[in-house]
Amino acid sequence: MLQVGFRLRDLLTQAGANVVMTRTTPDPVDLGLRAIISRRANAHAFVSIHLNAFPDGVNPFVNNGSLTLYFWPQSIPLGVVTQAALLDELGLRDNGTKYQNIAVARGTWMPSILTEGAFVIMPDQEAAMRTPTIQEAYATAILRGLQSYFASLAPTP
């Protein structure tokens, strides 16, 4: 989902954020290295953008939609607001915000989430994710989640 990552980078930059991408080409980057990159950058948040799929034998008509995963408890608030924005922007089934022992987030110390915008095993969701409109919606959802999360940390007057 590099296209979504690039669009999110542009949206965040326009909003005044400093963005460090752990991957800018289709070549894979080791999951542990992604955490190291985020720590070295002193990132305030880490978001890993994905599309979900299931192994053989899992019913895709039961398991489909958007999902946000976290490893560390301090990531729950970011996950919850991002998941809500994903549902609003993409309009897919809510698979929740859930703990999972995800390698990409274990080595981070900032709020870290992994988003699964849709399921590529579902032909309609896969086709939609290939369109610029839905890619923009996915990026916008993550932007909204980050904005909501950081706004919640601001001191009240």
Q: Where would I find each of the regions flagged by the language model?
A:
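Active-site-proximal helix/loop segments of hydrolytic enzymes
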Residues: 2-157
